[in-house]
Amino acid sequence: MARHLPFLLDADPTAPFPPAAQALRDPDGLLAIGGDLAPQRLLNAYAHGIFPWFSQDQPILWWSPDPRMVFRTDALRLSSRFRRQLRSSSWTVRADTAFEQVIDACASVPRAGQDGTWITAQMQQAYIALHELGHAHSLEVFDGTRLVGGIYGVAIGQMFFGESMFSAQSGGSKVALAALAMHLHTEGWPLLDAQVENPHLLSLGAQRLPRAQFLQQVQLQVARPALPGTWSGRYGQRPASSLGEARLT
């Protein structure tokens, strides 16, 4: 018999999640409710293809939609026009030098069709804690000293789970996404999780992956050796113009 209610999580952050395959069909992917955003629970969730997503006036909701949106890190779609703009860009890209500013901007930058944000203060503090533990990372795009775009997410093993991105200037988020995809591809990470389908992600080359296949990939990739600690030294500072020559679709 199909379930019509999500699982209720208890207060123990080490308690296991129910299998993601048991998520509801309506609303698509809702698996569990409650618990907290402790680092142990978040890492356990992501390692099993589950992520939190809820509004300020809701309890913590945990999701694993079917299908799942992913980017193959060698197949980000960049238009010829955008590549030409990149080749003449003076912007630079860094990693893990402005994580808190990126997550704050993702929470506060206005978005078409959205009223308010799901990146609550509680969510921000949870991901900042993961960042301080070396599990959450950001790619940041600068125009001089001004932050004009960025993306952040969670890394476990060799799997990156994207959370949100922003633009304070046209193209900023696209540059951040391209920089992240290129970095992951260079390191041999094949997938970037994009969570939930939307037209913008599809236009950039995101693909629908059946949840069962996604979970198989997650299980494989999270078991592989990670990049420990901060990425700032490993990544350094790179010109955004180099992305115009990147071998992405």
From Swiss-Prot:
Cleavable signal peptide: none
Keywords: Acyltransferase, Cytoplasm, Transferase
MF annotations from Gene Ontology: leucyl-tRNA--protein transferase activity
InterPro entries: Acyl_CoA_acyltransferase, Leu/Phe-tRNA_Trfase, Leu/Phe-tRNA_Trfase_C, Leu/Phe-tRNA_Trfase_N
Reactions catalysed: N-terminal L-lysyl-[protein] + L-leucyl-tRNA(Leu) = N-terminal L-leucyl-L-lysyl-[protein] + tRNA(Leu) + H(+); N-terminal L-arginyl-[protein] + L-leucyl-tRNA(Leu) = N-terminal L-leucyl-L-arginyl-[protein] + tRNA(Leu) + H(+); L-phenylalanyl-tRNA(Phe) + an N-terminal L-alpha-aminoacyl-[protein] = an N-terminal L-phenylalanyl-L-alpha-aminoacyl-[protein] + tRNA(Phe)
Function: Functions in the N-end rule pathway of protein degradation where it conjugates Leu, Phe and, less efficiently, Met from aminoacyl-tRNAs to the N-termini of proteins containing an N-terminal arginine or lysine.
Protein name: Leucyl/phenylalanyl-tRNA--protein transferase
